[in-house]
């Protein structure tokens, strides 16, 4: 039976992990075992935080809309209810951008709703 040499396969696998761990501090970028643990943790955190980022932006948009709407005596939930009642389809992101950047058109929108 012939000898199977697969040293480069294992080396390539380890180098791939060490390449992902570049920039980590201390032994986390030098030693394979700690680098592997740190990259797994970093990748899971990045996945989790990509999901959390969406939630955080929705919170920011809602608070911006709520602050802009309260100047006219409404609150966020009644504003959304009136938008739905008048069949105006604007998502939270666009509403918050209008409220932040173009107050005149936002007041026109509020006048149309109220």
Curated annotation (Swiss-Prot):
Keyword RNA-binding assigned: yes
Protein name: Large ribosomal subunit protein bL20c
Lineage, uppermost ranks: Eukaryota, Viridiplantae, Chlorophyta, core chlorophytes, Trebouxiophyceae
Annotated CDD domains: Ribosomal_L20
NCBIfam families for the chain: rplT_bact (TIGR01032)
One GO term of the biological process aspect: translation
PROSITE patterns in alphabetical order: RIBOSOMAL_L20
Keyword Ribonucleoprotein annotated: yes
Family of the protein in this entry: Belongs to the bacterial ribosomal protein bL20 family.
Organism: Prototheca wickerhamii
